Curated annotation (Swiss-Prot):
Component of the 19S regulatory particle (RP/PA700) base subcomplex of the 26S proteasome. The 26S proteasome is composed of a core protease (CP), known as the 20S proteasome, capped at one or both ends by the 19S regulatory particle (RP/PA700). The RP/PA700 complex is composed of at least 17 different subunits in two subcomplexes, the base and the lid, which form the portions proximal and distal to the 20S proteolytic core, respectively. This is 26S proteasome regulatory subunit 4 homolog B. InterPro entries: 26S_Proteasome_ATPase, AAA+_ATPase, AAA_lid_3, ATPase_AAA_core, ATPase_AAA_CS, NA-bd_OB-fold, P-loop_NTPase, Prot_ATP_ID_OB_2nd. Keywords: ATP-binding, Cytoplasm, Isopeptide bond, Nucleotide-binding, Nucleus, Proteasome, Ubl conjugation. It is found in: Cytoplasm; Nucleus. Preferentially expressed in the root and shoot apical meristem. GO terms for molecular function: ATP binding; ATP hydrolysis activity.
Length: 443
């Protein structure tokens, strides 16, 4: 009892570890928590290099999503279109009802008359082709801005009130005369004729492009020119080159088109032609074969000849009347200038006369070069033999010779034109020319 505490216990009353018991574990800090959502790096090695990559159908899903979005857009557009149609349907029905009311007020049939004088916004004096003049009213739905003295109007069949305006439309024949597409021929396609090109530029092109030059020098530009010469010398070709080089409206008409069947239609067509040219100014009016209507006036024995003379008188009036032509230039062409009426050729109407002679040696050489530039010629071809010939060639004859020589080469299945082909072509063209033209016609 008197013994002290046992040596096996420590100060706190715990038993000291014996040598045979395990020692306590050392304190180790807890491992940090793994990061969520972070992709762990894969160990690189020989196994990773040999492993195939994982492929997911992400591209197909994106394409399908894009397709569905596009379909949705189309469906939304269709829905909006259907909604607009339903909303506009009552308005269309109302507009149709208003149109039917206007038709009932106009009545059928309607008379055609002329507006003589506009009294006020609601009343006017009108006349018909047969009968006296009337003081009538103007219905409220008529466009007052288009009413002007002299215009054609529609009148009620019974009360003769103004119910509409008859629009003055362009004659279909005149609309056909307008050259919509510029010709492909240019001044570079014309062999020679340098003096003629210079004259027509001064008389036709320069007044339209630079009118201030004529004002500064104090002269009036020419109103028109006439191109005359033997057939095939390049008159129509030069007119096409003018149409190609200028931006003005080009109206082309053949003289025979101005001769109409019924009385008064020819002068009316001439007036309509120049009215359209004035509306579309700056413009150029080209009348080919003017000798069809511009021949010398004699005592006419038939109604047809008198109608041709009336057409020519209207043409004279349009060329040099009280109304100034302004930016409208006239080009006439003929190969029989001696048969034209002197009144048509006097200065003031046609201020410049341009002659087209047969080509000389220099011009022939240039024309042959133009027409053979795209042809495949053999080495034995000598064009100087045809240039220096004494036969009278026109530009059209030279073109016909080149074309005929090419056809002869094609007939023999050859891709090159030889000198013999040109000789045969020349003989053929000259034979047809001498056979087809009456002797002494162009002397």
């Amino acid at each position: 009892m008197g013994q002290g505490p046992s040596g096996g216990l420590n100060r706190q009353g715990d038993r000291k570890p014996d040598g045979g018991e395990k020692k306590e574990k050392k304190f180790e800090p807890a491992a940090p928590p793994a990061r969520v959502g972070r992709k762990q790096r894969k160990q690189k090695g020989p196994e990773a290099a040999a492993r195939l990559p994982t492929v997911t159908p992400s591209t197909k899903c994106k394409l399908r999503l894009l397709k569905l979005e596009r379909i949705k857009d189309y469906l939304l557009m269709e829905e909006e279109f259907v909604a607009n149609q339903e909303r506009l349907k009552p308005q269309e029905e109302k507009a149709e009802e208003d149109r039917s009311k206007v038709d009932d007020l106009r009545g059928t049939p309607m008379s055609v008359g002329n507006l003589e004088e506009l009294i006020d916004e609601n009343h006017a004096i009108v006349s018909s082709s047969v009968g006296p003049e009337y003081y009538v009213g103007i219905l409220s739905f008529v466009d007052k801005d288009q009413l002007e003295p002299g215009c054609s109007i529609l009148m009620h069949n019974k009360v003769l009130s103004v119910v509409g305006i008859l629009q003055d439309e362009v004659d279909p024949m005149v609309s056909v005369m307008k050259v919509e597409k510029a010709p492909l021929e240019s001044y570079a396609d014309i062999g020679g004729l340098e003096a003629q090109i210079q004259e027509i530029k001064e008389a036709v092109e320069l007044p339209l492009t630079h009118p201030e030059l004529y004002e500064d020098i104090g002269i009036k530009p020419p109103k028109g020119v006439i191109l005359y010469g033997e057939p095939g010398t390049g008159k129509t070709l030069l007119a096409k080159a003018v149409a190609n080089s200028t931006s003005a409206t080009f109206l082309r008409v053949v003289g025979s088109e101005l001769i109409q069947k019924y009385l008064g239609d020819g002068p009316k067509l001439v007036r309509e032609l120049f009215r359209v040219a004035d509306d579309l100014s700056p413009s150029i009016v080209f009348i080919d074969e003017i000798d069809a209507v511009g021949t010398k006036r004699y005592d006419a024995n038939s109604g047809g000849e008198r109608e041709i003379q009336r057409t020519m008188l209207e043409l004279l009036n349009q060329l040099d009347g009280f109304d100034s032509r302004g930016d409208v230039k006239v080009i006439l062409a003929t190969n029989r200038i001696e048969s034209l009426d002197p009144a048509l050729l006097r200065p003031g109407r046609i201020d410049r006369k341009i002659e087209f002679p047969l080509p000389d040696i220099k011009t022939r050489r240039r024309i042959f070069q133009i027409h053979t530039s795209k042809m495949t010629l053999a080495e034995d071809v000598n064009l100087e033999e045809f240039v220096m010939t004494k036969d009278e060639f026109s530009g059209a004859d030279i073109k016909a010779i080149c074309t005929e020589a090419g056809l002869l080469a094609l007939r023999e299945r050859r891709m090159k034109v030889t000198h013999v082909d040109f000789k045969k072509a020349k003989e053929k063209v000259m034979f047809k020319k001498k056979e087809g033209v009456p002797e002494g016609l162009y002397m």
